[in-house]
């Protein structure tokens, strides 16, 4: 580790292979906590490259719980968090809209870190059992079309690093890589990130991970979701090409909605919002979900255009399919699935 620390002190970038090896060292129980803290802070001060992000992602996915990965066509729409906007659970609500549109969703997520309610907190409040094994997750993806992957359970080697991150209380590379460490072999992905200058590096990592299609967005107001407040900065990965662009919500018929208008609350309050959206209630929450789910359906390839994605998202809700997916996941995740273990 000392060699890597010296390079970082000198402001030098690590190669992908160096970062991969450093990542394995970070996960080693024999490494000193002071070394982990120094590495994370120095890397942050230097600025992370796509190669460094990918090298660490390789190490984390290698040490994650193993999956059979026989499920084809899975997608995730997990964002990085960390935008400080305290919005309701946009991506988790959108995940059921995607599932209702016949997209297999492997939703990677965690409890609240910088927000009041994380995806795990919301799903537990709704009645979903978030303690699923890899075999159970495969079963849920195949038979329900949506499954939740509780990040701490999927990545047990990260427990020590999580403690150090909390003690440091500053953003590190781990604030960026949550969506990139999903242990399921995804085909497509929709990623919201809070740092605009990392749009391209994250898209490049998704390309290295072999995604067929992906869309990375930094919303207006630096939201880690697509925002109805104004211009959204976007990077699209398709046919192995990366294109940078921007998207205005007005173009798709949405009224401007300030980010403050879509703030959430505790898990009970956010569960009420999610159920309202999935039940077809008209609101700024619904419009925000339609925009995000529409973009995700476009990123997935289920929709050929963003307009078509928004139409499919609305149908998923208004037909009752999105809510049905939630109810099915609640029932199936709470069954005893010994037959798949």
Curated annotation (Swiss-Prot):
It comes from the Bacteria. Anthranilate 1 binds at residues 79, 110. It catalyses: N-(5-phospho-beta-D-ribosyl)anthranilate + diphosphate = 5-phospho-alpha-D-ribose 1-diphosphate + anthranilate. Binds 2 magnesium ions per monomer. One of its GO terms (biological process) is L-tryptophan biosynthetic process. GO terms for cellular component: cytosol. Its cofactor is Mg(2+). One of its GO terms (molecular function) is anthranilate phosphoribosyltransferase activity. 5-phospho-alpha-D-ribose 1-diphosphate binds at residues 79, 82-83, 87, 89-92, 107-115, 119. Pathway: Amino-acid biosynthesis; L-tryptophan biosynthesis; L-tryptophan from chorismate: step 2/5. Anthranilate 2 binds at residue 165. Catalyzes the transfer of the phosphoribosyl group of 5-phosphorylribose-1-pyrophosphate (PRPP) to anthranilate to yield N-(5'-phosphoribosyl)-anthranilate (PRA). Homodimer. PANTHER family: ANTHRANILATE PHOSPHORIBOSYLTRANSFERASE. This is Anthranilate phosphoribosyltransferase. It comes from Bacillus cereus (strain AH187). The lineage of its organism: Bacteria, Bacillati, Bacillota, Bacilli, Bacillales.
